[in-house]
């Protein structure tokens, strides 16, 4: 495929990707795709460096949304016990442990539809406290108003996560209580407040190839591109609508990572949920395809994650260095 042969061109950020072109990239011969993705990665990022972030559920369960993949939804009987918002000191203690363990970004997630006024101040205190430790800060709190986004930025928020989940045409199969446009509007408010955008999606939900390509095209059409792009593999939870979904073929997952790297060359592409079910070899292929960020810690919100020593053992065997505090993970554009 001629497009994959021009690495210098592929390494330039563009936001005019079409589904047709993205599909040609996704379906390219596997060796050509991986070679191109790794070449783009080396042009735009340190070749053997991966960012390590840690994610903490600061408010678990009882969510009013009906996301078909989520065990925190109040719509499904998954046996998860809902909890109130964690105390500030407990969150900061967890952040300190994350930093001591090598994490350079600390992410805080709350299971609710939107940030409520009564919780704004304590959330801002959490952000300020983590920021004072020298780590990057990230939260995922559902929908926001413009004033809330500005308040979070003033507290020191670096990144806001709000995933698109899937392609627009596949979205109604996954969730009915929030529209696709709601998600786009929230991301626009985040960007307008000067906060970096973290948005991606979930694969392995029974979607077809076209939906995966559609999701990636939506993300790569954002101007500017999201700074962080988490690619999650569904962790199927019993008693949720998507609990019987079959895992996505590993090669298809790697194709998704590689295509994300090519379409969004300067974004951090994160291996997120689902790594616990992946072999070391599959994860290594994902790093080869351009993934350069992971979550460390035993849990991602409420789903299992590889133990941190397993991750660093894998890094050692692959010659990968964890990103240090203050490093950006990108090579300056020429």
Curated annotation (Swiss-Prot):
[4Fe-4S] cluster binds at residues 63, 67, 70. GO terms for molecular function: 2 iron, 2 sulfur cluster binding; 4 iron, 4 sulfur cluster binding; biotin synthase activity; iron ion binding. It catalyses: (4R,5S)-dethiobiotin + (sulfur carrier)-SH + 2 reduced [2Fe-2S]-[ferredoxin] + 2 S-adenosyl-L-methionine = (sulfur carrier)-H + biotin + 2 5'-deoxyadenosine + 2 L-methionine + 2 oxidized [2Fe-2S]-[ferredoxin]. Binds 1 [4Fe-4S] cluster. The cluster is coordinated with 3 cysteines and an exchangeable S-adenosyl-L-methionine. Binds 1 [2Fe-2S] cluster. The cluster is coordinated with 3 cysteines and 1 arginine. Its cofactor is [4Fe-4S] cluster; [2Fe-2S] cluster. Coiled coil: none annotated. SMART domains: BATS, Elp3. Pathway: Cofactor biosynthesis; biotin biosynthesis; biotin from 7,8-diaminononanoate: step 2/2. Residues 48-275 form the Radical SAM core domain. Its EC number is 2.8.1.6. [2Fe-2S] cluster binds at residues 107, 138, 198, 270. Belongs to the radical SAM superfamily. Biotin synthase family. Homodimer. PANTHER family: BIOTIN SYNTHASE, BIOTIN SYNTHASE, MITOCHONDRIAL. This is Biotin synthase. It comes from Maricaulis maris (strain MCS10) (Caulobacter maris).
